[in-house]
Amino acid sequence: MSAATTADIDHYRTVLAGAFDDQVLEWTREAEARQRFPRELIEHLGARGVFSEKWCGGMLPDVGKLVELARALGRLSSAGIGVGVSLHDSAIAVLRRFGKSDYLRDICERAIAGQAVLCIGASEESGGSDLQIVRTEMSSRDGGFDIRGVKKFVSLSPIADHIMVVARSIDHDSASKHGNVALIAVPTSQASVQRPYAKVGAGPLDTAAVHIDTWVPADALVARAGTGLAAISWGLAHERMSIAGQIAASCQRAIGITLARMMTRRQFGRTLFEHQALRLRMADLQARVDLLQHGLNGIAAQGRLDLRAAAGVKVTAARLGEEVMSECMHIFGGAGYLVEETPLGRWWRDMKLARVGGGTDEVLWELVAAGMAADHGGYRSVVGASSA
């Protein structure tokens, strides 16, 4: 897949500018106050063409548009809203590539139009990110599949219509506890969504456990046993790229607002910005956020979704984002600690999700490590073949 042209990206930016209007800002403010995700926001973005324009090129994502949407979400400075929309879009990515039946295509098209909301049910209490040992079971019956299990962290499940469920097929080995991973779409109406969790941050991102004990038709199968990990990994790579883009934009907004504070707040006869230590600390953060933006642009220019690059840029962005929000909150001083006076405390709490959601730092570093290549020839040339 080729990278989007400048004209394509410019057009998509225009679409985003029209869609992310005052109504979206108001829904975001209300969502932060109510700690609930507004389904109408996804409906609005779908109706305004945000998803259809992004997916008009085919079954693979336009990475440039993926990054632009992520930046628009990041500028909202609401992790709950940003991650919620990107999870819906990541489920679309999975269906767009792997959903072959008319049933799945219909779900996908309705999700793109904003007429259906999607979520992903992967992690369980038993294994977290280790999806090889999922306990949710899938078995064939009557031209379809029985699905039984409990998913612990299913964001958007309280408002979603369909869950992309990671399950383990037990058709050929009922005692199996590892592997045979599949992916299947389950209507939320056929599952039991529990009470949403109280969380440290990202309040509007309604996240709950989901209990599943139902039957679905064969047409609901997204990825057969043995290919489910590949399918969900594709969706996770999409989500990781989005998280990185959201962080880049939210960090830039936080830095800009903090700089404004530094240029108006005076201590010891000078503005905070005139104090060299503070000014250079912010310059260091700005330089690294700029590098993150350039990295995202570089990945987008390749024109394809690269699983290893997505893992690397997400973990790097998450750790940088945590530092940026912490430093900005620090520079605000006591006001940064007052939740009714500034949003810095909320932004700081929200950013913690980035180091866990979509894969922890350690899981993502393992993906990066798996693709590293040793330079044996270079080693021999500088150290010598006989050295231990």
UniProtKB/Swiss-Prot annotation:
InterPro entries, alphabetized: Acyl-CoA_dehydrogenase (IPR050741), Acyl-CoA_Oxase/DH_mid-dom (IPR006091), Acyl-CoA_Oxase/DH_mid-dom_sf (IPR046373), AcylCo_DH-like_C (IPR036250), AcylCo_DH/oxidase_C (IPR009075), AcylCoA_DH/ox_N (IPR013786), AcylCoA_DH/ox_N_sf (IPR037069), AcylCoA_DH/oxidase_NM_dom_sf (IPR009100)
One GO process term, biological-process aspect: fatty acid beta-oxidation using acyl-CoA dehydrogenase
Pfam families, A to Z: Acyl-CoA_dh_1 (PF00441), Acyl-CoA_dh_M (PF02770), Acyl-CoA_dh_N (PF02771)
Annotated metabolic or biological route of this protein: Siderophore biosynthesis; mycobactin biosynthesis
Enzyme Commission code(s) on record: 1.3.99.-
Keyword vocabulary terms for this entry: FAD, Flavoprotein, Oxidoreductase
Cofactor(s), by name: FAD
Job of this protein: Catalyzes the dehydrogenation at the alpha-beta position of ACP-bound acyl chains. This results in the introduction of a double bond in the lipidic chain, which is further transferred to the epsilon-amino group of lysine residue in the mycobactin core by MbtK.
Family note: Belongs to the acyl-CoA dehydrogenase family.
Protein name as annotated: Acyl-[acyl-carrier-protein] dehydrogenase MbtN
Lineage: Bacteria, Bacillati, Actinomycetota, Actinomycetes, Mycobacteriales
Gene: mbtN
